[in-house]
Amino acid sequence: MPSIQELIKGVKSTDRASLGRAITLIESNLPDHRELAQELLAELLPASGSAHRVGITGVPGVGKSTFIETLGTKLTGLGHRVAVLTVDPTSSRTGGSILGDKTRMASLANHPSAFVRPSPTSGELGGVNRMTRETMLICEAAGFDVVLVETVGVGQS
């Protein structure tokens, strides 16, 4: 894993690999990662807070992912930089996401002005995971001016 300073530099320059690694560090439950995650957040916090944040929720199959891909594509077409954070049910076997909403947003996920990141609920109730807020801050520090959060389907957490 790169150093915290390398991650900060990468996030601020919107390097997708650095952004993904930073989010993985923030979501990690490993004790060694907690202090590093706090250092990362402390450094990135001043560069966050200016994005529009929108949460999308609904029952499974209602079209949340389709709506988000359409909205995200429209927003990127208008010049916005869009981050999409999808929260999926957690696999009891692997601890990861089991639905993979990113696969349903392939066009948006490949757009140069968009970033799509699935995350598991990690057993949390309420539709998002315990680090969704911090993940939004990291995306804002990376320069995304719209952050869309797709909650786990109603009744799936």
Residue ranges, per PLM feature:
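Nucleotide-state-sensitive switch-loop elements of NTP-binding domains
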Residues: 3-54, 62, 68-157
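Residues at the beta-strand->loop junction immediately N-terminal to the Walker
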Residues: 57
